[in-house]
Amino acid sequence: MLLADDRVSVFFDGTLGDPQLDHPEGVAVATDGSVWCGGERGQIFRLDPDGTSIEEVASTGGFCLGMAFDRSGDLFICDMKHAAVFRLEVASGRVDRFCDGAPGRPFLIPNYPAFDAVGRLYVSDSHRFGAPGPGVFRVEPDGRAELWYDRDVTFANGLALAADGSELFVAETFASNLFRIPIREDGSAGEREEVAHVPGSLPDGLAIDVDGNLYVGCYEPSQVLRIDPAGTVDVLWHDVTAHTLAHPTNVAFRGTTMFTSNLGRWHLTRIEVGIEGLRLPIGDGW
């Protein structure tokens, strides 16, 4: 493993609290340093930057999966129960149903959102459990969507855009693959390029650091992988007890610290990576 055990700890334990942090899947960091995550009953939680308190800000009424902030500070949440992407206007607390998919092609399992530099939202669609299918949608700022990558994927999951916006990394969970899709000059999707195969692992959430390393939260086994730009795969940290890392899913950076959600328990984990994460959304203006 690349990291010693003392670099990994529980950031917030919501097992017995009120509100209870129930099996969080998505995690995102706001510009004020607060850490946001979702619950299995649609709750949207905000944790103070130091992890000392939690507030249920809003709810989709469904099951929250991946989430991402846009440049204005609003939070976008993929919801499995409603098969939709919701938008939380953070300033007012209002939740709107933002997108249901493309005309004639609704979302099936919208799983993970990622913004590009001009405010378009890429959304993975996991299709169906056990049935490969397309793919990745792209949603305009006004909510209009297209099926951007229409090739079959075996459970498209986490997404991460390269710093220059030239390619989109995708976790293909049930094939144990990571691949990238070049974004052509006209904005269309290129052909997939394999990044790494991680046999025995179920890759879920993705994040990138400023050196171009790709970080992968793995639902099984409970570990985070790091893949360098050459495609070398290392285990950043593995929890053989599935206790501190308990089936981690999504991962998000705040400076050199990474936060992981844990679908298997009721807490968030903090990992001191030691390398600055790529600030999101990508692009100039920070």
Name each model feature, range by range:
Residues 176-177, 196-232:
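Loop/turn-rich, solvent-exposed surfaces of beta-rich toroidal or solenoidal domains
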Residues 43-45, 84-86, 134-137, 177-179, ...:
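A short loop-to-beta-strand structural motif that recurs across blades of beta-propeller domains
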Residues 39-40, 80, 126-128, 173, ...:
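Short loop/turn segments immediately following the C-termini of beta-strands
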Residues 48-52, 89-93, 139-144, 182-187, ...:
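Short loop/turn segments that connect beta-strands within beta-propeller blades
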